[in-house]
Amino acid sequence: GNGRLGAMVYGTPGIEQIQLNEETIWAGRPNNNANPNALEYILKVRELIFAGKYLEAQTLATEKVMAKTNSGMPYQSFGDLRIAFPGHTRYSDYYRELSLDSARAIVRYEVDGVQYQRETITSFTDQVVMVRLTANRPGQITFNAQLTSPHQDAMINSEEGNCVTLSGVSSLHEGLKGKVEFQGRLTARNQGGKIACTDGVLSVEGADEATIYVSIATNFNNYLDITGNQTERAKSYLSEALVHPFAEAKKNHVEFYRQYLTRVSLDLGEDQYKNVTTDKRVENFKDTHDAHLVATYFQFGRYLLICSSQPGGQPANLQG
């Protein structure tokens, strides 16, 4: 994530799925669900609590203090980026990594003697999701990519310049019609091979390497103003990101992230299990008391907050 966007990489070789979030996609619309009569009863609720009459306090609060209109609007996902790689269902030497040092997700594996790598960043500096696809032999990058959405009325189109768009609006919730409008834009830049865009599917065939770009934006300006232009915003993010080569974009992204990460370090001793995968280290923790894993979890928590909320944006949600 980069504070505004989030990308969850599943890492399946044959069909990669990357769930996409944008921080302002919420169901319903801006509204005030505060109970206007709440103030009158809050003091009485407090008195009941301090008197140890908890059930009475709860009953009174539910009846007189809680909202009567709705329980609040839920956060919603934008959708998924799905990338199909023909012939990649039978693979070997699979490896995946989330780099807490550089905020990158990496997947590597081998198919028919060819080594493939996917490197995903949600760029802090370019405000788009990038997926870098490489192989150790030329002409081996072939895929079909598309955007999908759980929103029933989402519209998918192909545009000039080998670009797929997905446009929609947030869902109805508790009687409030969704009014947060959003658009995602998908394109790619390839070296060698062919690229085409037909019926909402972006296809690359026989490339030496390629980079997939996803831009997402909404009409949200602030809590009371959703009159922004999501299409122009998504176009702007994408066009500005395409100016930079991936190597430069990654360098800028990592440098931005590390200015937060390196503020704090935690050393709990030597890493005695560096050759053991993280899932096994968690499983074995009750026996190993793996101190380095504790330090890693500490930094993982910091990584999550850095990547889920940035200055000027929304506070991190789904933290319960």
What residue ranges belong to the model's regions?
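Aromatic-residue-lined binding/catalytic grooves and analogous aromatic/hydrophobic interfacial grooves
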Residues: 1-320
